[in-house]
Amino acid sequence: MNRVPALDRVFHERGRLALCTTLIANPDGISFTALQEACSLTHGNLNRHLHALAEINIVDMRRKTGAGRPQTIISITPQGRDQFLEYIDALETIVRKVQSAAEPGASSNRLATT
């Protein structure tokens, strides 16, 4: 039986996957409004996810003031980046194993999650 790596539950949810993917692509940070639009989340849902992720040092939220309205800028922390990339590596391993097992003539070994 082939062992499949465990997936970090912190990221294994559609909203958080979208959030972290967007934040990785915007290393200098992104406004709350732009992040909300990019991830197609409601204000309340995004706010809940961000506060949960900030509590475990995955994201950083800071207020930016200056010309115009103040904005909340969200960025992924170095720890968050490392953890998210580890999650993506584990997910890629699972995808490769499933693709290999699905090929014609593949052995009948079953995949097991840990």
Report each predicted region and the residues it spans:
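Short beta-strand "wing" residues that participate in macromolecule-binding interfaces
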Residues: 61
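Amphipathic alpha-helical dimerization/coiled-coil segments
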Residues: 1-4, 82-114
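N-terminal helix-turn-helix DNA-binding core of bacterial DNA-binding proteins
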Residues: 2, 6-45, 66-67, 71-75, ...
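Short, hydrophobic-biased segments on the C-terminal half of alpha helices
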Residues: 50-51
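Glycine-centered, phosphate/nucleic-acid-interacting loop/turn motifs that mediate DNA/RNA or nucleotide
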Residues: 57
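A cross-family signal for key residues in well-ordered alpha-helices
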Residues: 18-21, 54, 85, 92
